[in-house]
């Protein structure tokens, strides 16, 4: 069997089923990698919680809602760590302008629960905070309220409070019941967010106008401007993005997703749920799409073009974009050919990016890992990896150090929590969750990512510190 127990895991042998070495001789689907389970005690995980999954991923990118976190101050602060991850524009679907640009990045409200609130209950405090927040920000179109571990344990009824406040305030007040302990990873929060939005919002409003070429772009969160790249491609093809779920989206867009002609699911781990629900109830079909890397981007633009009879327009976009990026792609391939890379993403990016990085940059993908991926995602990683690649579910800190020692990656695509850990080991790291200098999606986005990888590897600082092969001046070529 191709499962592997790393040396550091001798005292937690259960980890063996979470670590897989690709072997093409094994029958396809024969080895089911263990995943989406509670982290084993003693394993220093890098995972986020269910609350992070709903607020930090699903709803954090919406431009015109106010977020109220029912928690002690720590969870509220944690819930506001979106930084540049989800930029928004003030323009609204009806032509009006939202009064605060990047409102979602600037404001969050918490109930600041204390010991007394835990003992006697915090529902009255929550009502008071919602009323005060509504007066402070009267222009928001909805208020989203979040449970956390503390309020989940004491049993505060967020649904009842939100129902009462919605009637009082005359705007949608929606409860998201995903306290941190609700699931093994942030993936549970994705699930709760999808179902809450579908059950409470989808089908409750009508769009200002519709066309025969309307799509929902689902699971696209506009990380560092990703959505705006795809929006331009679709615009050039004559296709209208009616609703986003949820990058640069408005509350209203979530309410009229049922009016689209087709849904495209970009992040297949966090948002396939709502696409399935919309198809089942409203008959809107969906396609799973991948826009990372030139080949996948072209392939999926063609699929969308074929669905709407826009094949010629799709080919024109592909040709124009490839002509733009080819010279830079050739340069970065010449500099990155053969260099070892570890892709350590939360979920789908680990399998989205492995083949394009090998195909267009000539890099050697030696390791793949995920923090909250499910079985179908690991099957895709296994399918796209070459023999000998190590694939890890929920890697802990000691495992990461051992993988660096044994597989010698020259760069890691990972998250902010791991970035400086790898730096201490002398390995450059580029953030793949919120990006360094994005966007990373689409044709030009792939070049942006290649540039950041190149700059990180050839940064002269590594040579000055006695690590790597950075050469002064190389990063400025």
From Swiss-Prot:
Enzyme class: oxidoreductase
PROSITE patterns registered for this protein in UniProt: NITROGENASE_1_2
Record GO biological process: nitrogen fixation
InterPro entries, per the entry: Nase/OxRdtase_comp1, Nase_asu, Nase_comp1_asu, Nase_comp1_CS
Binding, [7Fe-Mo-9S-C-homocitryl] cluster: 267, 433
Cofactor binding: number and manner: Binds 1 [8Fe-7S] cluster per heterodimer.
Required co-factors: [8Fe-7S] cluster; [7Fe-Mo-9S-C-homocitryl] cluster
UniProt keyword annotation of Thylakoid present: no
Catalytic reactions on record: N2 + 8 reduced [2Fe-2S]-[ferredoxin] + 16 ATP + 16 H2O = H2 + 8 oxidized [2Fe-2S]-[ferredoxin] + 2 NH4(+) + 16 ADP + 16 phosphate + 6 H(+)
EC number: 1.18.6.1
Free-text function comment from the UniProt entry: This molybdenum-iron protein is part of the nitrogenase complex that catalyzes the key enzymatic reactions in nitrogen fixation.
Quaternary structure, from the entry: Tetramer of two alpha and two beta chains. Forms complex with the iron protein (nitrogenase component 2).
Protein name per UniProt: Nitrogenase molybdenum-iron protein alpha chain
Gene this chain is encoded by: nifD
